[in-house]
Amino acid sequence: MGLQDRALFQEKVDYTLTNQSNGDFEGQNLANTSFAGAVGRGANFRGANLHGAILTQGAFAEADFQGADLSDALMDRADFVGTDLRNAVLTGIIASGSSFSNAQIEGADFTDALLDRDDQRRLCGEADGINPSTGVATFDSLGC
């Protein structure tokens, strides 16, 4: 990371350990933003750029990440129960210890994602669709 990149990162709002439940972040550029330990239950991240974001230990149950770019995000030990991840780009994420129960994943791209084996198997049973941004099938991206 160069000096210019660090300066850009410092301009981002830090949402660490905050309550963002039902917050509206639709379409926003939140690349490299920290939501570590944040509560974002029911929040709207539809179409947001969350590339490289930190969502570690966050609670995002029932949140809407439809069409969002979550590539290279740190999403470990987080709650994504019932989350809408349809058509989201989740390439290269680290999501070990996270829960994706009842998440909607049609068209999501999980290429090179680090997931718990049990989550991967469960998601494979629900995998359907092709990501409109990357052209990759959800089933294939999960290595099913």
Located regions from the model:
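Tandem repeat scaffolds
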Residues: 1-143
